[in-house]
Amino acid sequence: MKKVLIVEDQRMPRENMERILLDSGKYKLCASVNGADVALAVCRREKIDLILM
C-alpha cells in the first residue's frame, strides 16, 4: 500500500482529498497537513511514496 502525504492550506480541498484516498482503499494516508514546515517534519519521520499538493 502506497503511503501518501497531503499538503493543502485550504481545509475543504484537503478533506476532499482525504476522503477520496480513504474511500479508494488503495492508499495509506500518513498525514494531511496545511503547511510546508509540518510536511517536511512528516517526511523526516515517514517514508512517503506520494505527496499531493
Regions found by a protein language model. Give the residues of each.
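Two-component/phosphorelay signaling modules centered on CheY-like receiver
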Residues: 11-31
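Helix N-cap/capping motif at the beta->alpha junctions
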Residues: 32-41
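Active-site beta3 strand of CheY-like receiver
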Residues: 46-52
